[in-house]
Regions:
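Ferredoxin-type iron-sulfur electron-transfer modules and their immediate structural context
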Residues: 128, 139-232, 272-305
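Long, charge-patterned amphipathic interaction tracts in eukaryotic proteins
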Residues: 2-71, 77
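Conserved active-site and cofactor/substrate-binding residues in soluble primary-metabolism enzymes
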Residues: 23, 50, 61, 223, ...
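Long, acidic (E/D-rich), serine/proline-rich intrinsically disordered low-complexity regions
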Residues: 81-83
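Thr-Gly-centered strand-to-loop micro-motif
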Residues: 212-213, 238-240
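Loop-centered beta-sheet repeat module
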Residues: 91-142
């Protein structure tokens, strides 16, 4: 296990086997739980991006990338994207009227603070540097996510935006259809191919799959167990506390045991009109909504002070 998978299981109270090697070559092995950690603080230097980009592969061969949970097949066979659209905090406060150094928010369920702009942040593509007490976090909101080039850590952020003036209010009115989503070639992610919007990615589509056990053929080698980026499916069981709603299972199960409408999108690429299925999400709107509603309730009960 690496990264987010370890962080999640420690918070769940599970036992972790640790093996480290010193610079002198000495090996130290131990078994630990969260109780063995005196203090834990997560400091994310580049987090909470203002939405992101969609990717396709126009080449023939599959391409490994951090922007796809599995190698993305060629010939425009599928689209992968990141960003929760109009739920994104920075998208709702584009000029940083409210979200500033010292802003309090919920970071995986724990009270956190904005330390400032994240590394490589810019006016066009802002992100944040965030921190919170790791031991106070809810394991549901963070974990590991496997990509075509290794593991990543996913986190969930909910930032309050008090309406202090008309400009802040107007910024909050933005909706998915008005948020542009750049489309890029996954092999050269800075090469634009066109654009779409977040309404095309999210509106009317399912946030979680339905698993039909009766359709499962108990394959000797289960494709979904192998490719699920959060290890949410094993032993013919779908663990919804781990499911990220990425949609891969619905597209790659050989027996169609998973039912999930992740949608498709009409695009213009290099002068051609094409329809491409959305096969992989790297953002989870369900978790984002849950944490936002949790923050709202804490504010209403005055358990969270702005």
């Amino acid at each position: 296990m690496v990264g987010g998978f370890v962080l999640k299981e420690l918070l769940e109270g599970k036992t972790i086997d640790v093996r480290v090697e010193s610079v002198e070559g000495k090996t130290i092995e131990n078994t630990i739980t969260i109780e063995d950690i005196g203090r834990g603080q997560i400091i994310g230097t580049r987090m909470a991006f203002k939405n992101y980009t969609a990717f396709v592969n126009t080449y023939k061969e599959p391409i490994n990338s951090i922007f796809s949970a599995i190698p993305l097949e060629g010939n425009l066979s599928g689209l992968t994207f990141s960003g929760c659209g109009d739920l994104n905090p920075l998208q709702n406060d584009i000029p940083h009227n409210v979200i500033k150094t010292g802003t309090r928010f919920l970071f995986n369920g724990a009270e956190g603070y904005v330390l400032g702009d994240g590394t490589r942040s810019s006016a066009e593509k802002p992100n944040l540097m965030l921190t919170a007490d790791y031991k106070q976090m809810d394991p549901y909101y963070l974990g590991g996510y496997k990509t075509g080039q290794g593991g990543e850590v996913y986190d969930t952020v909910a930032i309050p935006i008090p309406v202090l003036n008309e400009e802040i209010y107007n910024n909050l009115l933005i909706t998915d259809e008005n948020i542009k989503l750049p489309l890029a070639e996954i092999k050269g992610r800075h090469l634009p191919l066109g654009e779409t919007n977040y309404k095309e990615m999210w509106e009317g589509y399912d946030l979680r799959p339905q698993y039909g056990r009766s359709k499962c053929s108990k394959c000797d080698s289960c494709t979904i167990e192998e490719i699920c980026p959060t290890n949410a499916f094993s032993n013919e069981r779908l663990d919804l506390t781990r499911c990220f709603g990425c949609g891969l299972c619905a597209h790659f199960c050989k027996n169609d045991a998973f039912d999930m409408n992740t949608g498709d999108v009409d695009l213009e690429i290099k002068g051609n009109q094409v329809n491409v299925p959305i096969i992989c999400r790297q953002s989870d709107r369900l978790r984002g909504n849950k944490l936002s509603n949790q923050l709202k309730k804490l504010i209403e009960t005055q358990e969270f002070t702005l």
